[in-house]
């Protein structure tokens, strides 16, 4: 069965997020995240949080990682589930130094799907 228009739009929002990581271009992230979005994670067993604006500003130089062209950085959308105007997405970022799993909550507002919440875990790889 072909994906619904909403599933295609959710995947497009998640793809903007992935492109932001791949290119270092914050404009992709701004297309992915709602302006009021928040990020949460556990650091040393303590809840940590930041706004999407803070996250996007910390992205760095606006250029791709030095090893981006080598193909060692892998990114994929593993799951999308849409119900009405709410959706979830699971993204896996497999980098040489870390394995990251992002769980995104998305809402459709004003006809657009945006990430409104991100929780994630990072597992550093042994060198």
Protein language model regions, located:
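Surface-exposed, charged secondary-structure patches
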Residues: 9, 38-99
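Short, solvent-exposed mixed-charge patches
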Residues: 1, 126-127
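Short, low-complexity N-terminal intrinsically disordered segments enriched in polar/charged residues
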Residues: 1-27, 31, 35, 53
């Amino acid at each position: 069965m072909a994906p619904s228009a909403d599933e295609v739009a959710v995947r497009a929002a998640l793809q903007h997020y992935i492109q932001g990581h791949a290119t270092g271009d914050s404009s992709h992230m701004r297309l992915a995240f709602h302006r009021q979005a928040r990020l949460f994670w556990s650091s040393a067993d303590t809840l940590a949080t930041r706004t999407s604006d803070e996250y996007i500003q910390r992205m760095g130089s606006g250029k791709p990682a030095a090893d981006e062209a080598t193909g060692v950085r892998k990114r994929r959308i593993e799951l999308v589930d849409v119900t009405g105007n709410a959706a979830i997405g699971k993204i896996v970022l497999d980098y040489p130094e870390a394995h990251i799993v992002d769980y995104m909550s998305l809402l459709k507002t004003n006809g657009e799907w945006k990430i409104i919440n991100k929780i994630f875990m990072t597992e550093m790889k042994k060198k």
